[in-house]
């Protein structure tokens, strides 16, 4: 017969305290630093679809091509878009082609080779402004419509899609 080791009361108490601390850290992390919004609309297809649930990390530190959640004064709602222009960049859209600082930008993540060329844009971004576009360029209200987005309106960066819409449907 084996002798079963029993935990000392002090060790059991320390394990309970450690479990409580870890639970608190996770709660605070998920409550204040990570959100799980649901995509509304088709503007980010094919990357994300209407109904997809995203994990978003609260941060203002975003980089080129990051997908972010931002507040839109014009639409009076949060939007999910891709960062196309950074502070100090010159963005031009002409003839359905995108140029950043005079260089044509080719984007493998969009389906449309030619997108709505009726919208012409030329903007110099200020030190606290970003240019955001939806991946579904022909069906997106974005910086082409409402202009540059101030840094203060960016809520956070999309980490991943945690649940695709097709996984949410039950038959």
Kindly label every feature range from the protein language model.
Residues 138-145:
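Active-site loop architecture of trypsin-fold serine endopeptidases
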Residues 83-124, 129:
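Structured, soluble extracytoplasmic/luminal domains of envelope-associated proteins
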Residues 1-78, 90, 149-171:
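Protein maturation boundaries and topogenic segments
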Residues 134:
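Phosphate/adenylate-binding glycine loop and adjacent helical scaffold
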Residues 131, 147-148:
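Conserved, short, structured surface segments that act as functional micro-motifs
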Residues 61, 99, 104-106, 138, ...:
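Active-site/binding-pocket entry motifs
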